[in-house]
Amino acid sequence: TASSISFVTLAENMNNHLFHKIIAINPPMPEKFNRTPSNSSTLKKALLEVPILGTFIYNVKTHEKNIQKLFYTEYFNKPQLASSKMLDAYYEASHMNGSHGKYLMASIEGQYMDNCILHALKKLSIPFYVVESRSNPDSVQIVTSYAKQSSMIETAYISNVKHLPQLEAPDKLAEVIRMLFEREEK
């Protein structure tokens, strides 16, 4: 889902026997991964890695209310589908192991997780599927950007969901994936 697709794509590029198919769910524009750390992003990373201040910032950003707000405004199209059990699981996961998640957040904020995937997309030798939510205002542009990179890339849209269709409408997402796989078999 989302930015994690860069790691999978680059792993496939390095060893093309790792995967048989790749499914990207709501990935950002492939060009988004072509960033390098700036002075401000490096400062954000450094602040998050400072022991007391960084932990405080991390705890504020991963506070229960902020996680709930993220689900209600960005992750789910229908906020009522975000169960308290799901929200609790996300909150607990963000605070396991002594808040070491702040180092991942620091790397993301510092743009250290952005790895250019354009060259890897062009060299694909396996099916690569992009499933994009229609709720994303840039969905057409994103899908078009991926599709023009390689003939191995197939695309589909999913409606009435936002960023996490695997949680919001798993049956609908499974149907879209099944449809993509059937299209490949023909």
Predicted regions, residues:
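Glycine-rich nucleophile elbow surrounding the catalytic serine of serine-hydrolase chemistry
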Residues: T1-T9
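Short aromatic-enriched loop/helix-cap "lid" or pocket-rim segments at secondary-structure transitions
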Residues: F33-S38, I142-T144, E168-P170
